[in-house]
Amino acid sequence: MIVIAQPNATEEQIQRIVTRVREFGLEAQISRGASRVIIGVIGPEALLREKAIAAMRGVEAIVPVLKPYKLAARDSRGASSVAIGDVRLGEHEDVVLICGPCSVESKEQILSIATIVKESGARILRGGAFKPRTSPYSFQGLREEGLRFLAEARAKTGLPVVTEVMDPRDLPMIEKYADCLQVGTRNMHNFSLLKEVGRSRLPVLLKRGFSATIYDLIMSAEYILNEGNPNVVLCERGIRTFDNAARYTLDLSAVPILKSKTHLPVIADPTHALGLREFVPQMSLAAVAAGADALMIEVHDSPEQAKSDGNQALTPEIFAELIPRLRAVAAAIGREM
């Protein structure tokens, strides 16, 4: 990073800045101009010391040279892809549909829905065995029984399974059944959980927190990458704004912005953003047009009887009608589905 000294900074103040930088174990290089002095700070922990240096007398501004997210940054490496089972997600791959119910409710239910979504074109099965609910009295999921049902659905259909992990203590159990770990919106800032999934052998689908900035999301991904897991997928799932016409606002600008800043696959979840079945198809089409590498769409064969979020799940008929429209949009931007 670069430290810009104030125009009236004294030589004593400049030397104190240099001394402090070197006390942090960093290298300081002074460059003297006609009216300003700048100090180049070099070292792996330079950005971590930014606030301490900025508070010193004689400092006008700090200019970071490198991004604080080193592992997630796109830089010159281009886009990467992530394998979930035998399905690859990424900028240079086909657009993928990740579909299924909000919650696994029974063996019969998940087997039926898995078959339906596969026949319509889905390539990955989603389903919650552990459910983070606003109310403690709401359905919390079937836990390991639900995981077993998901594994049976995978065996029947061949669809790899994505399911949410909420507690690091449940991770070993979930790893026995799942093909991908989902970190939900409420846990995007759960750094203990991020570190644990970062040590997992499974890929991680990281959802943006509903009050998180794009920078926050990337830094949460950095936690996972820093623990050694390179297989991270970013998911835009809606943010909380002043408007309450829908549950959240699906921030589709995040898709191209994230792609410009990171090499990680970026997907969208219009179901949870809207919370209303009637608007999910339109926003699904818009997400593909924005460049999303995959869509997460909830589908339920009896949404009126669903134990969670039935009003946002597409019926099999609506889902089947949406597929050719999604493929047409993908083709229009030079991609396949």
How should each PLM-predicted stretch be described?
Residues R126-E144, D301-N311:
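Glycine-rich, proline-tolerant flexible connector loops at the mouths of alpha/beta enzymes
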